[in-house]
């Protein structure tokens, strides 16, 4: 398919400012599809990430990139990225990633100038805030969060110097943080004592995308008074466009997150380096093999997953099974033996069984099968900050004076995000 050839004399003089700018749109649904089209036509290189699929029931809210009915059943991010290809300027790219935020680490965002959170639950927004704030300021992208509520549209742009994403979330909303939301709060209202999902339109979704695109445009150009502002569009009968300056929330747990003081760099990516290969690089830097690589720690939906499950028991019959997965990526169906899985045997409560303690760290002389696994398959997300511990003779972690901790990251992860299509 031939690309569109734009007449430069009919375009804005500042358009060249956008050509080397990469943007990640997290959530390729109602707002996200509108954003992808706008960003492509602005001359950006927009990537999209979403784990969900397009359905016919939501077709009326998506941007015109999505074709009905042929795109039903396709991954949202891959589909949106595919549809914008003819709109991209020469030299610009777009990649669609079938994934969720749990499989990304901080460094996965470091190659982007802007990250737009067009997601509809607070858990994802809180996790994104954690990941972004773990990046040093010189590699930290500007964040835009947008959404809709009824026919109102809103967008907030922030650089994490005055407040963070968590500051924009009322802690009362976190009681059910997985509920469908927008940036204004839960999209559920009480009607006659019953909860009712608030409905929004394509107009509201496209307006939210337009506000975000305008904030990005003005930020790139360098207009004053753009950064750390909230734009709100209110529809008739109270038509209004307002600007507000959000404030830092007192004792905000998100603002308390800071990047490591120092990061040591390894070559490659978690996608193609084995545990043995990583340990060899770490040993060269530390000058010793006497260290431990902590299993990746994932804190999501108020649960901490920090173990690697080597073996467990079938949660149907109790027979021993090999798992070899990070506990944050284990689903109930993964904990059945082949016989019970084939018979679709019902799962019993985990409390019915005795379990082996998962690994909390990997060591130089560990099991060979684990040593040969790729880091990503061991649970380290793309862009991970990997903690390495040297005990230096300490008997336990109470003897903190002897223990040293070093953070490592891979120098290829920030580029790999533009190549992969599924995590």
Regions found by a protein language model. Give the residues of each.
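Hydrophobic residues within alpha-helices
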Residues: 35-36, 80
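A structured beta-alpha segment of the ubiquitous adenosine-cofactor-binding alpha/beta core
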Residues: 72-126
């Amino acid at each position: 398919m031939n690309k569109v050839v734009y007449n430069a004399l009919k375009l804005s003089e500042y358009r060249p400012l956008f050509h080397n700018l990469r943007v990640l749109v997290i959530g390729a649904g109602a707002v996200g599809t509108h954003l992808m089209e706008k960003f492509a036509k602005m001359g950006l290189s927009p990537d999209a990430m979403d784990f969900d699929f397009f359905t016919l029931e939501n077709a009326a809210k998506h941007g015109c990139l999505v074709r009905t009915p042929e795109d039903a059943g396709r991954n949202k991010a891959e589909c949106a990225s595919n549809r914008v290809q003819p709109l991209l300027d020469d030299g610009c790219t777009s990649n669609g990633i079938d994934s969720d935020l749990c499989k990304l680490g901080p460094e996965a965002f470091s190659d982007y100038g802007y990250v737009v959170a067009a997601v509809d639950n607070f858990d994802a927004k809180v996790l994104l805030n954690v990941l972004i704030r773990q990046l040093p300021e010189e590699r930290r992208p500007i964040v835009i969060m947008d959404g809709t509520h009824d026919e109102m549209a809103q967008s907030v742009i922030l650089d994490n110097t005055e407040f963070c994403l968590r500051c924009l979330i009322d802690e009362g909303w976190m009681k059910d943080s997985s509920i469908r939301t927008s940036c204004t709060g839960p999209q559920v209202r009480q009607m006659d004592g019953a909860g009712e999902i608030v409905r929004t339109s394509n107009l509201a979704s496209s307006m939210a995308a337009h506000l975000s695109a305008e904030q990005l445009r003005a930020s790139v150009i360098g207009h004053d008074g753009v950064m750390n502002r909230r734009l709100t569009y209110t529809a008739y009968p109270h038509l209004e466009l307002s600007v507000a300056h959000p404030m830092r929330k007192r004792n905000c747990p998100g603002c308390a997150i800071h990047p490591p003081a120092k990061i040591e760099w390894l070559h490659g990516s978690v996608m193609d380096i084995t545990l043995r290969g990583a340990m060899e690089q770490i040993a060269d830097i530390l000058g010793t093999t006497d260290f431990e690589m902590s299993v990746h720690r994932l804190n999501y939906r108020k649960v901490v997953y920090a173990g690697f499950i080597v073996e467990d028991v079938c949660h149907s019959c109790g027979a021993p099974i090999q798992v070899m997965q990070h506990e944050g990526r284990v689903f109930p169906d993964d904990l059945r033996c082949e016989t019970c899985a084939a018979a679709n045997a019902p799962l019993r409560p985990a409390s019915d069984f005795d379990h082996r303690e998962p690994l909390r760290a990997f060591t130089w002389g560990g099991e060979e099968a684990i040593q040969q696994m790729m880091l990503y398959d061991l649970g380290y997300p793309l862009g991970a900050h990997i903690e390495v511990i040297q005990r230096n003779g300490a008997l336990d972690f109470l003897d903190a004076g002897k223990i040293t901790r070093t953070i490592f990251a891979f120098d290829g992860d920030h580029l790999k995000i533009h190549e992969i299509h599924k995590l």
